[in-house]
Amino acid sequence: MATIASEYSSEASNTPIEHQFNPYGDNGGTILGIAGEDFAVLAGDTRNITDYSINSRYEPKVFDCGDNIVMSANGFAADGDALVKRFKNSVKWYHFDHNDKKLSINSAARNIQHLLYGKRFFPYYVHTIIAGLDEDGKGAVYSFDPVGSYEREQCRAGGAAASLIMPFLDNQVNFKNQYEPGTNGKVKKPLKYLSVEEVIKLVRDSFTSATERHIQVGDGLEILIVTKDGVRKEFYELKRD
């Protein structure tokens, strides 16, 4: 006859009990950055979730950090907020130490690398992207892993729906698997910069499609556009279900 495990049985008392606190969570959402010839775009949806619950329908994921540098750290929202605040403080201290000299985008990338690497034993659980203009006035997008490894890219998506959006960006921005008509797939289309209008349309299409397929993305879309004249913001509604 099978023994029923209870609080008094040996089977129950021998079962290991897990006493563990998980300090991390995933609050959903998606971000993406695209670099243009003389501009850069960073976008993110505004949904904040825990499991199947929506915590907020407006939780911004993209931030203007000054000096024509915009930033997003998506994943665990508390870690993302902490990293953005630390970087904004770094920008202020750079101004104090260098007589209000502007921080360049490549120096910003190196600074964020140090912030992330310094926390490598208890990392910020985020995918980080920054965007801005380089010394030549060209758009620049840098993406980071949680411990500080980074690279400059033409475009990058991160977060819940990155696996849905990135193949679309590879095709439409990096022109992967695109060939000149009439060449039977032998002559690749040359890379070219897209206009601001084309990029914003791609961003909106990317997020509109992602909201149809991923429950962690939706509600609103914030887009920050960086040009030599500064940073401007655009907002568009997304699906709320």
UniProtKB/Swiss-Prot annotation:
Keyword Cytoplasm: yes
Compartments reported by the entry: Cytoplasm; Nucleus
The protein's name in its UniProt record: Proteasome subunit beta type-6
Propeptide: 1-19
Keyword terms of this UniProt record: Cytoplasm, Nucleus, Proteasome
Gene assigned in the entry: PRE7
Short name of any one Pfam family annotated for the protein: Proteasome
Subunit structure: The 26S proteasome consists of a 20S proteasome core and two 19S regulatory subunits. The 20S proteasome core is composed of 28 subunits that are arranged in four stacked rings, resulting in a barrel-shaped structure. The two end rings are each formed by seven alpha subunits, and the two central rings are each formed by seven beta subunits. The catalytic chamber with the active sites is on the inside of the barrel.
Functional description taken from the UniProt entry: Non-catalytic component of the proteasome which degrades poly-ubiquitinated proteins in the cytoplasm and in the nucleus. It is essential for the regulated turnover of proteins and for the removal of misfolded proteins. The proteasome is a multicatalytic proteinase complex that is characterized by its ability to cleave peptides with Arg, Phe, Tyr, Leu, and Glu adjacent to the leaving group at neutral or slightly basic pH. It has an ATP-dependent proteolytic activity.
GO biological process: proteasomal ubiquitin-independent protein catabolic process; proteasome-mediated ubiquitin-dependent protein catabolic process
Domain of life assignment: Eukaryota
